[in-house]
Amino acid sequence: PWRKKRLARQGMASGGLREAALLFFVMFCAGLAALTVFPAYFWTAYHWQEALAGHEVFFPLTPLSESIQEIQWTPTVLQNLREGGWGGYMAIANLLIFCPVGFFSALLWRGNRCMRGLLTGFCTSFCVEFLQLFVGRATDIDDLILNTLGGCLGGLLCLIFAHLAPRF
């Protein structure tokens, strides 16, 4: 009700399906943050038991100088796709995980849908990669490239969807 009133004051409206899409996008972003920004072991029961007992740091931070030395600056996307295996799987996963970011940003905020998806994918991926520097997660240029392309692909899918369901 609050959002509906606020939109009405601005002379705008949003249907139930659009609001459901917004809710799904928020839930997806929360899941994406849980998957990418927190340390890999953060969600384990052992970590919580040890942290709550005071035997382990709740949210350990990695020194920036240490993280910067481990960044993979050379793109290996094509090589990973050619060779397949784990690298190929991760390349495809990085592309697909950001399709919803591009799709929902293009769906929810009007304008050039592909460009909106590309920019949102890039900015979100850049923020994730930057935050990963501080929590001991791997950061590399491939993630930024593939996540950005995934956002663009999501924007393109939204463009197709908009032609199929123009009133959504």
Show which residues each predicted segment covers.
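Bulky hydrophobic segments
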Residues: 1-136, 156-168
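Alpha-helical transmembrane segments that form the membrane-embedded catalytic/substrate-binding core
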Residues: 139-161
